[in-house]
């Protein structure tokens, strides 16, 4: 099953008040594991970048002005994600920005199935902090390379968090006679009522370690 981890960075909080995308990143998963394929671009917002955004992301107007505008990258972005389910932390935020940008260039809004890991975390750990940082600390995922918020590094971290939220690799993942998952498509919506699987209690296999190493190598190219 192909899924896409997706994250964005923006100039602010509200695209309806003129805030724009400044970075988009996507990481491909197959059966919940990174394949090493990813899409990443910085985006010229065609406006100033507020100081607060620069402090969070490290991205400045001067840096972004030499990068493509959204209309120039939209087709490549859509071609990468295709109709695959999107895995996003706080999905409403990223989808709001993407859909406003797409609408402004006369393209249809995204209709992909969505998995919101914020929803998953709040359901699995009610009352506990559910930010990406908090979940990384909970699952002992290394945050040492995350000095600023960046869409690509956040996708890498979210891919590890998502695997843990699902209970670990292939835990309870059964194939039916037709070769498709018996878990069904309902799990791919925010309204899913299925119980999440318990946390994994075993170490990474050698195959997982190899795949993760290949993924990190691809990100650093």
Describe these PLM feature segments.
Residues 85-88, 92, 97, 101-102, ...:
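Acidic, Mg2+-coordinating catalytic module of metal-dependent nucleases/exonucleases
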Residues 1-112, 122-126, 134-148:
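Conserved non-catalytic scaffold segment of RNase H-like nuclease domains
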Residues 183-221:
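Acidic, Ser/Thr-rich low-complexity intrinsically disordered segments
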Residues 130:
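Glycine-rich, pocket-lining loop/helix-strand segments that form or immediately flank
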């Amino acid at each position: 099953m192909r899924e896409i981890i997706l994250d964005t960075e923006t100039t602010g909080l509200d695209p309806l008040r003129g805030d724009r995308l400044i970075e988009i990143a996507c990481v491909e998963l197959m059966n919940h594991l990174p394949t090493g394929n990813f899409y990443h671009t910085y985006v010229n917002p065609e406006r100033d970048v507020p100081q607060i955004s620069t402090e969070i992301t490290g991205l400045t107007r001067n840096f972004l002005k030499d990068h493509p505008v959204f209309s120039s990258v939209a087709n490549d972005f859509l071609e990468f994600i295709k109709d695959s389910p999107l895995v996003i932390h706080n999905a409403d935020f990223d989808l709001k920005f993407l859909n406003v940008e797409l609408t402004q260039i006369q393209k249809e809004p995204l209709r992909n199935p969505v998995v919101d890991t914020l929803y998953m975390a709040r359901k699995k750990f009610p009352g506990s902090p559910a930010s990406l940082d908090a979940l990384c600390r909970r699952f002992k995922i290394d945050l040492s390379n995350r000095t600023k918020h960046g869409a690509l590094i956040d996708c890498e971290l979210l891919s590890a968090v998502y695997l843990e939220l699902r209970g670990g690799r292939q835990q309870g993942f059964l194939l039916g006679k037709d070769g498709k998952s018996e878990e069904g498509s309902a799990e791919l919506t925010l309204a899913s009522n299925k119980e999440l699987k318990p946390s994994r209690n075993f170490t990474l296999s050698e195959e997982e370690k190899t795949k993760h190493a290949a993924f990190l190598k691809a990100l650093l190219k």
